[in-house]
């Protein structure tokens, strides 16, 4: 493995100045895509994901519909300008197809698809800027976009990442930590139900480090959840003020 250009962890401090259990700055805006039924933009530091939801609506072609539940389709895509790597083909990459499937499976436990028989819900996610943790930022954005669309949900799904960097368990991996760390653990968590919907383990973890990582992921998800709730409330308070006056 290549050495990182800078030390990733020294004297209890990460290369970007954060403590091990500290998220990057989290910014969330709901209702950012005007022609979508629901949308959200989520930034974890420099990583920015925009999600737009269309539906529930009638399934076409009809033979793909299910009589007892709706179908959710998720498309994850990285904008050509989101990374320094040159992207020549608009065709989805193998990684984008895989992450699309992972995100759909992480969102489905939170969505009451039984309320929407013979219907479909389309979720489109665009990564505008990538600096680590893109799939978990996408998960949070997609969950908020579904809520903004008025889709029946059991809980929000909050995505966070935890990793091993120079033997330390750290929260919210940036690009350097994602590239040069010894392990990573993307997590999807429903804070009210206290259930995980996504756990992907990469690297060599001891049992103790893994349990430490799970606890840190829950802490991070609960922090982001408060930001997500505030963003949803802010949008609908603004709408109410526009309708009824201040």
Curated annotation (Swiss-Prot):
Disulfide bonds: none annotated. Its EC number is 3.1.13.-. It is found in: Cytoplasm. Component of the archaeal exosome complex. Forms a hexameric ring-like arrangement composed of 3 Rrp41-Rrp42 heterodimers. The hexameric ring associates with a trimer of Rrp4 and/or Csl4 subunits. Belongs to the RNase PH family. Rrp41 subfamily. Its main location: cytoplasm. Catalytic component of the exosome, which is a complex involved in RNA degradation. Has 3'->5' exoribonuclease activity. Can also synthesize heteromeric RNA-tails. One of its GO terms (cellular component) is cytoplasmic exosome (RNase complex). The lineage of its organism: Archaea, Thermoproteota, Thermoprotei, Thermoproteales, Thermoproteaceae. InterPro entries: ExoRNase_PH_dom1 (IPR001247), ExoRNase_PH_dom2 (IPR015847), ExoRNase_PH_dom2_sf (IPR036345), PNPase/RNase_PH_dom_sf (IPR027408), Ribosomal_Su5_D2-typ_SF (IPR020568), RNase_PH (IPR050080), Rrp41 (IPR011807). Pfam families: RNase_PH, RNase_PH_C. Gene3D superfamilies: GHMP Kinase, N-terminal domain. This is Exosome complex component Rrp41. The keyword Nuclease applies. One of its GO terms (molecular function) is RNA binding. Keywords: Cytoplasm, Exonuclease, Exosome, Hydrolase, Nuclease. One of its GO terms (biological process) is rRNA catabolic process.
């Amino acid at each position: 493995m290549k050495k990182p250009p800078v030390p990733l962890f020294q004297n209890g401090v990460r290369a970007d100045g954060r403590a091990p259990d500290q998220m990057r700055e989290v910014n969330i805006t709901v209702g950012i895509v005007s022609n979508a039924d629901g949308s959200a933009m989520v930034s974890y530091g420099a990583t920015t994901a925009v999600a737009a939801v269309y539906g529930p609506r009638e399934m076409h072609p009809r033979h793909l519909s299910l009589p007892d539940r709706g179908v959710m389709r998720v498309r994850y895509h990285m904008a050509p300008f989101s990374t320094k790597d040159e992207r020549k083909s608009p065709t989805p990459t193998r990684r984008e197809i895989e992450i699309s499937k992972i995100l759909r499976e992480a969102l489905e436990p939170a969505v009451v698809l039984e309320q929407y028989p013979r219907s479909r819900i389309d979720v489109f996610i665009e990564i505008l800027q990538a600096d680590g943790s893109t799939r978990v930022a996408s998960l949070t954005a997609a969950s908020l976009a579904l809520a903004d669309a008025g889709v029946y949900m059991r809980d929000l799904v909050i995505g966070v990442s935890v990793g091993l960097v120079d033997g330390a368990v750290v929260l919210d991996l940036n690009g350097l930590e994602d590239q040069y760390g010894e392990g990573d653990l993307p997590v999807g968590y429903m804070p009210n139900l206290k259930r995980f919907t996504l756990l992907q383990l990469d690297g060599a973890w001891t049992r103790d480090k893994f349990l430490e990582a799970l606890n840190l992921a829950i802490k991070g998800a609960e922090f982001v959840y408060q930001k997500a709730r505030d963003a949803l409330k802010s949008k609908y308070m603004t709408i109410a003020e526009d309708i009824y006056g201040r």
